[in-house]
Amino acid sequence: CADYLFDLAELGVAGVNFHGSFNCRGYTSFCALKNGGYHVHGHYYGMLFFRQAARGRVVTLTRSGDGANLTGHAVLGDDGSLRVALINKDLESDAKVAIHLPERSGQASVMRLRAPAIDAKNDITLGGAGVAADGTWKPKSTESIAAQDGIYPIEVPAASAALLVIGAERPGTPADPAEPSSRPR
């Protein structure tokens, strides 16, 4: 889902509508539970990952090498941060990535999208946290990666994604300071 949304953003598409239902049968991004809460599906986590990654202007990312079925997308934030979304669609192979940014230095924050299996319906996390039954989400964990001679090394496990933020903002901070969390609406 996130990869598709990035493809559309890179083509200049300004909005996307996804269809679903509020019952928990069939395929939907999230559904309303009978007890009044929400249950989100994998598709929703892809949209949430995109929301965290796509805060700014899409910029070109050049890829070299081969190996895992890995895609990458980059966004330059208004605050000067560079957000690099790495999506490993390979079901078996981890991807070792070296992001070359000779003009940047210092620490980068990494937030990961993980699931126990590619078709998981539960235990999916972004930033070490799942979306709560009330629809709120607040990341619990990020990693730090230091540049080594202008290169940020990162490993992206099979069937997972990582958001690397170099610069002013940590991944998982609200897009709008008045909005303390991200939740389905």
Question: For each predicted feature, which ranges?
Answer:
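Aromatic/acidic polysaccharide-binding cleft in carbohydrate-active enzymes
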Residues: 1-81
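Flexible loop/turn segments at secondary-structure boundaries
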Residues: 17, 23-29, 91-94, 117-120, ...
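Carbohydrate-binding surface patches
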Residues: 67-106, 110-117, 159-165
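Acidic, Ser/Thr/Pro-rich beta/coil linker or hinge segments at domain junctions
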Residues: 104-152
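Compositionally biased regions
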Residues: 142, 161, 182-183
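Short beta-strand-to-coil "C-cap" segments at the C-terminal boundary of structured domains/repeats
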Residues: 164-172
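Mature N-terminal, pre-catalytic/accessory segment of carbohydrate-active enzymes
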Residues: 173-185
